[in-house]
């Protein structure tokens, strides 16, 4: 998922004056925000990543991993970052919600994204799920205007 984001959204991140990516619901350990920062900085070196987690204990445990370009915040779908992020990634988060709730959450998250402008399609929400070891993935990419793509990926 991260490689796809860097490849398809890297130019948009480079164009942004303050490229912020949010890893929403990173889980028990902070590895996914750390990996996201590494991947995105190959495409857009000024990108900052904010890991957002609903569990305060997980945020506290992640704080020792903070460094230039990487921060952790307590929160949820309100996305507690200043401004409008260029990217929100929510992996394995919405699969625990009822299907009827997903469209409202997508709309809420897309409302937080950077708006489209001259030469810009605006921010990107990438929401999806994978198996336990990350070999099979599916995700949808949405912008402020609505769905853009759906991707199925597998590693054999």
PLM segments and residue spans:
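Class I (Rossmann-like) S-adenosyl-L-methionine-dependent methyltransferase catalytic domain
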Residues: 1-24, 28-67, 74-79, 118-156
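Hydrophobic/aromatic-lined pockets within catalytic cores
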Residues: 41, 98, 114
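A short SAM/SAH-binding and catalytic strip from SAM-dependent methyltransferases
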Residues: 85-103
